[in-house]
Amino acid sequence: LPILRIDLIHIHHLRNMYLDIFKVAQEKNVPFIYTMHDFYSICPSVKLFDEETFLCNYNNQNGCSSCISKKFKLNINFIPLWRKEFYSNLKLAKKIIVPSSNTKNIVLDIYKDLTIDVIEHGYNQANKESNYSNIKKNKKEKFNIAFIGGISEEKGLRYLKGLIAEARKSEITIHLFGMAENKKYNTNKQNYIYHGEYLQKDLPNLLLENDIKLVCLMSMWPETYSYTLSESLIAEIPVITFDLGAIAERVKAIDAGWIFPIHSTAKDIFKFILTVKSNIAGEYQKKKENIRHYLKEMKSVKEMANEYARIYNKTINTFPVLAYDTNDTQSKIEFYKKSRELNPSSIKSIQEKKEYKRIKNIIKGSAPFKRAFREMKLYRETYKNSKWRNKILFKFIWYRIICLNTCSTFTKKYY
């Protein structure tokens, strides 16, 4: 961190990593913010999904034993220790951010005294093709519904199976844009069309071209946001989902679809789809109108980035860290004000010179040979056009090779 002059660390995920980054940041006096994209800080299974009961009872740590045994092949309930470690580190964050209020509430159920901000993800609306002549309509006017993304058990695979079975010999056609975990469903069947993988930017138009009337987002874990929902809304298509997580939160907020209890059956959902089909001019059109109204104010990626930029600037400028010179206690905001007064080449020259002096002191000092060599090498790789590039190599050769060999020869000769 000191070598790279890091002013702020933004952590997005730590899966397959150690938690050392928290302690190193604190030791080096570097502030960090943490954005939670899932529930890894609560359980390493990430999704809070129980294959037997669907809903994870995350508040009851004693009930975690059987789940841990199945998912991690361990007979030790390590969740209390896991949460203790995460909590002690999360308290050090200057800001904790989540993409939905539902996610915030779940995290606060476990870590009750944390301060958490909600910043919804942004999404850039693609230009939808207005040429509806591309729409693929069946002679019998089939009613098309779609599943989107990678459909695993926790993403509602059992409902894809169930609805395919119900749709046989009906006027309902089911489409899958993406792939199913069970390869059996990665091929066409009666009243079922498998489209396979797609580019994210193409999805809204794919939904329109295939005349999709409803999108089924049947996640069985509390998703923290859902870009597939955003893509469905951009295509102005109402959705069916469960009363769970950020998807339900967002659908309720704009009345963009229908929400079912988590233990609803595929038969229940199919019956409802038939009622929507029979009354396509009624409530369905109201949902579409709500979506159109929402799209006028839908947050863009740029707007989201601006929210984060404000947090970055506020955190960097107010955190009491030392500037480049360890003897200079000016605040970061003063440093950046001075930087703006200089042209980029002047700033780079100052950085090169300061770094040269720092590494020269390391070479001349008592630091281990390997560290001195590593610092010298990194400087030469970083500042390839610097006028100090060859000087630092000479300093290393002089102090670490010539001087040491001379001293060694002198010692052997006279002592």
Please name every model-derived segment.
Residues 87-88, 92, 104-124:
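Helix-loop-beta element that forms the nucleotide-linked donor phosphate-binding surface
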Residues 216-227, 248-249:
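Nucleotide-sugar-dependent
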Residues 27, 57-95:
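Membrane-proximal helix-turn-helix segments that form the acceptor-binding/catalytic region
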Residues 267, 281-317:
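A charged, aromatic-enriched C-terminal amphipathic alpha-helix characteristic of glycosyltransferases
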Residues 138-155, 161-164:
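Conserved donor-binding/catalytic core segment of Leloir-type glycosyltransferases
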